[in-house]
Amino acid sequence: MPQRSALTRSVHYGWYVVAAGTLCVFAGLGFGRFALGMLLPAMGASLELTYSQMGLISTSNFVGYLLAVLVCGYLSSRIGSRLLIFLALLLVAVSMLMVSQAQSFMTVAFFYTLTGMGSGASNVPMMALVASWFSTGQRGKAAGFIVIGSGFAILLSGKLIPYLNQLREFDGWRISWLVLGIIVLIISVICFMVIRDSPGELGLKPFAGMGSSRKDGHFPFDDGQKSVTRKDIYHLGAIYFLFGCTYVIYATFIVTTLVQERGFSEMVAGNFWSWVGFLSLFSGPVFGTLSDKLGRKTGLIIVFSIQMCAYLLVALSLPGMFLYLSIGFYGIVAWSIPSIMAALVGDYVGPQKTARVFGFITFIFALGQIAGPAVAGFLAEKSGSFSSSFYMAAMFAGLAVVLSFLLKKPAQVS
């Protein structure tokens, strides 16, 4: 017991929860969703998929995600976030193993829907735990470190999947799904061993920063604003919807665009995607911390402006050097919005209501994720190019800038 007390004084246990959260996002979202972009070209060729079917496979994942976030708040309150996260990651692992054996579009879509359910049921409670383990002035940074798990997954998948795919000429992608599923299975056990539902279980208080004189953090609205209205929550949901609709178009179709429209090999396109993963490692911590310092609204405006530029640079079919710039813009802010939104919800409603409210706006976010790839695939099929899809993403990102500008600070919400 004395040894544990000494350890928690030097490193607050909340940071161990953050580390487990990084692994959770790495497995549930990083492999469960973002690896798809690297796998689609090979799967499309092997299973003879159309652009629309590729888009619908991605959409099936988001349908599952949508269904999961509807019940996350209820399940979390009944069985606890720790057990829910473990079971959700277990579902991700098993469904990915089943995708590796799929022989048709419908089979892939069915099991990838289950993957989406596991992704949603692990991600929402994990992000909501930030409000329980950290006070307001630390939430952006803590959430930022959790969301970079997706970046690590993209970085690894961009290198690993092309290697695994070439092990078998026509269906190496099956090996990729198998390996990824096994990794997720291992991570589910690690998360169950490390995560705790609240600092109170260990006799601790939420982390407020080194040397903080306030036990509840250094903002007066750490317990949430009772004056927050339903309109304010819908406002947050609208912003999160636009993020869901736009970022997923890029994540799903950029590799396919590079391979099928720009003539890049799968290996070179994988290197591009790995750069997204590497750069995204900085996105959550940098912009999450920036939102702690400059305000959530300023952080959102900066991030959406950069994303709009990333989408336009692909849509305009400019020379190759601009693709590098687009990759750079997308990567450096890739996971910033979820970290800022998780912190912002905690600022608005406090730790006790964060899981429920974050689950609600994540439901709206998931609607955007369903609409985005489906519409993008349809536009690409009709126009013969993904340029129209990226133009749409840029327009929606611009709208998100405007909505972010109109956000009220938590203390000003009435």
What are these regions (language model features)?
Residues 111-148:
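Cytoplasmic helix-loop-helix junction between adjacent transmembrane helices
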Residues 48, 80, 101-106, 263, ...:
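Helix-breaking motifs and short loop linkers at transmembrane-helix boundaries and internal kinks
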Residues 95, 106-114, 321-329:
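Paired small-residue
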Residues 36-40, 229-284:
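Extracytoplasmic gate region of multi-pass secondary transporters
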Residues 90-103, 306-318:
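C-terminal ends and interior cores of transmembrane alpha-helices
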Residues 140-159, 362-372:
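Glycine-rich segments within core transmembrane alpha-helices of 12-TM secondary carriers
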Residues 145-200:
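Helix-loop-helix hairpin linking two adjacent transmembrane segments in secondary transporters
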Residues 274-284, 289-344:
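C-terminal transmembrane helical hairpin of 12-TM major facilitator-type secondary transporters
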